[in-house]
């Protein structure tokens, strides 16, 4: 991923954490949690729309098995997201111990969401998706009250210039698809020789 695109998507991911892009936004959130989302939505839309798709030299077909286990927090998450934002989601994937079905007492909720282009069609859709994902982290915290991270977030545009350092493609091998598309293709740059064996 090019440096310019990488920085843009880092800011976009920061927005999805809590809407805050700077310290002033953090203070603003004390007045109401939605205010930073409202204030910064326009900035995020411009960043997304201005992010160019780079020419990449590797591609990989991804196919992920559907989630078959019946763990109550995973099912609660699926039901919540399907009800609230399913039309904005390309896919939701469980990885870590949830993906391999090797849960232990201290397991946390490791999950990736890939957001489609329609998330970034308007401020309203962007704010809706961002605040819904933030609220859904309550389900993660019910599984693990010490959960130290929320969602891993990617956008549909990033599938064309995949951020391998943020989410190594090898993690898909141990993931399960909770909802959405379980087959897609990613394109990525060589980074220190990483993933060259996946070229198709």
What positions do the PLM features span?
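Detector for methionine-enriched segments
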Residues: 1, 77, 115, 140-143, ...
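Helical scaffold of the NTase/Pol beta-like nucleotidyltransferase catalytic core
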Residues: 1-93
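Histidine (H) residue identity feature
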Residues: 32-33, 73, 95, 117, ...
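Conserved NTP/Mg2+-binding pocket subregion across the NTase superfamily
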Residues: 45, 49-69, 123-124, 129-200
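Sparse, context-dependent recognition of short Cys/His-centered cofactor- or disulfide-binding micro-motifs
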Residues: 77, 94-97, 134-136, 156
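Active-site nucleotide-donor binding segment shared across nucleotidyl transfer reactions
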Residues: 78-109, 113-121
């Amino acid at each position: 991923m090019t440096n310019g695109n990488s920085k843009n998507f880092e800011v976009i991911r920061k927005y999805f954490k809590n809407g805050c892009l700077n310290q002033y936004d953090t203070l603003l959130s004390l007045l109401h949690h939605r205010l930073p989302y409202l204030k910064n939505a326009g900035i995020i839309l411009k960043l997304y729309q201005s992010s160019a798709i780079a020419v990449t030299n590797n591609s990989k077909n991804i196919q992920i098995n559907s989630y078959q286990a019946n763990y109550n927090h995973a099912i609660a998450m699926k039901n919540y997201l399907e009800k609230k934002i399913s039309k904005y989601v390309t896919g939701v994937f469980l990885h870590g111990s949830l993906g391999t079905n090797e849960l232990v007492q201290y397991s946390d909720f490791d999950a990736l969401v890939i957001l489609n282009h329609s998330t970034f069609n308007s401020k309203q859709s962007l704010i809706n998706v961002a605040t819904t994902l933030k609220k859904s982290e309550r389900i993660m915290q019910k599984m693990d009250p010490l959960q130290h991270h929320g969602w891993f977030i990617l956008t549909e545009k990033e599938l064309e210039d995949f951020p391998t350092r943020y989410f190594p493609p090898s993690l898909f091998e141990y993931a399960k698809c909770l909802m959405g598309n379980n087959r897609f293709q990613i394109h990525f740059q060589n980074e220190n020789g990483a993933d060259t064996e996946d070229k198709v």
